[in-house]
Amino acid sequence: MTLTLDEVRHAIVARENPTLTAAEVELHAVTVHRILELKQQHGVVILGHNYMEPLVYGLSEKIEQGDSLGLSRSAAETEAEFIIFNGVRFMAETAKILSPEKRVLIADREAGCSLADNFGATEVQQIRAAHPGVPVMIYVNSYAEAKAECDVCCTSANAAHIALALPGDELIFVPDLFFAQNLEDELQGRKRVIYPGQGNGGHGAVCEVHEQFTLDDIRAVRNGFDIPPGHPTRRLYVHWECRPEVLREADFYGSTTQISNDIAQHVAAGSLERAFIASECELTSNLMEEFPTVQFWTACSVRCSHMARITLEKILPMLEAIDAGDDLQQWEVDLPPKVIEAAAAPIQRMMELSAAS
């Protein structure tokens, strides 16, 4: 059931910065209410990544929210004709690959990713040629053309499991340099991990958000926010894409959903009073709303410029175009059938190996 306009107003006032003017609250409320109204009217699924700002994130039902792996599964399972993906372009591409018969839309097709933008199909071909016969595992933060050149895909939630499930004693991991190093540490010698940027092996890409966190930053948080290592009710969380030396300082590390689940478990047990998350700041914003009893130290200078391109003002016109039966070309994700077919294989293999865990 769609919220009334008055209910939306109250939710925005409770959720947002109290410095919002009455006019700003009204503008947001009218926009959100209209989006939710059209979403329900046309049976549109709105998938929301954890890095969306709270007002955008809140457009998605709980089952429509999550990290790349969860949203990929949701895209594959939905029967809706229209999928609006509130995330970045590679995520919307993945939804299209898994549901080629569906119409997948993204509010801004220029919403890229520093990992995907800096490592494409040509780079995959080069590293594969340098290591013939070695399986290539590609992080989901990549475009369809690059995925099409690989054997299996992975997300930050399942990379270690997928790596161990592959045949042989070595694998190629692309494109994330820091994630590859962290995966290598996690596997503890059970597999050799080959990755771009290793030795003289070309360049590796990094996440422009997570690379900002340094060891000095993490130690400053521990001291300034009083989160000593091993504290029973205070925890420091780190995302897989951070530098290895930062990851080693964590009380818990993982994907956004793994971090969220750990917080939920500790809150349920009454064993979490304070937390810091070394990741995109809107993840913390959304968790602050979900877990109001936890004191979070925010890092909201650390924002993904690509995720920030997805706004209420860009989402509403898509739904209005659906309502009017207008052309959706400027928002629609369109991939060549051959690319969809080739990129689907490594994603489907990931799904199969994940389900076997």
Predicted regions and their residues:
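Active-site loop-to-helix "anion-binding N-cap" substructures in soluble metabolic enzymes
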Residues: 1-357
